[in-house]
Amino acid sequence: PVLFLADGIIAQMMEPVEMPEMVDYKIDPEKKPWACTGWKPGDDPAKRGVINSIYIDTETLSVHNDELQACYREITANEQQWEEYNLEGAEYVITAFGTVARIAKSAIVELKEQGINVGLVRPITVWPFPYDAVKKAAEQPGVKAVLDVELNEGQMLEDVKLAINGAKPVDFFGHLGSQMPTTEEIKAKIISMKEGK
């Protein structure tokens, strides 16, 4: 199964898409016992891919929780995805996902024309969150601050702050109620940060 997460704007857009030739991936349940691969009568019920944490016996529960944590660590290590844009020489870094990341890219292009170099880190996966990528971008020489731009009231903001861990100031700009942040608003926010406001 594939799950696409999209905001309201992306969900209503249409544009040409090039799909690569389909590859039929066969998942070996023995290699990924955590994956929900379906179950049919006659299969071993213990291998259904159901995540269960209702174990009355504390020792069994402890072993099970250790196994889950090992899975989470493996997923975190191998499944982070993100895009970096215009980070080289950036004075400011924007973090944004979904539609807002597209708008932020337009703002970055226009700010560059005004002599302000801004980069972007766009998480493709929000879990596992690309903490190291955000941290690395923020710690580049010359980066003064990070602006988190979202189409909400900061659902990703805490993760951005955790990634940066106080190394640089983090500011936030967002909108609610289907009101989209504009290129001009993002530019104005970066300019106000540059001016120390």
What are the residue ranges of the model-derived segments?
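Conformationally flexible catalytic loops at phosphate/diphosphate-handling active centers
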Residues: P1-E84
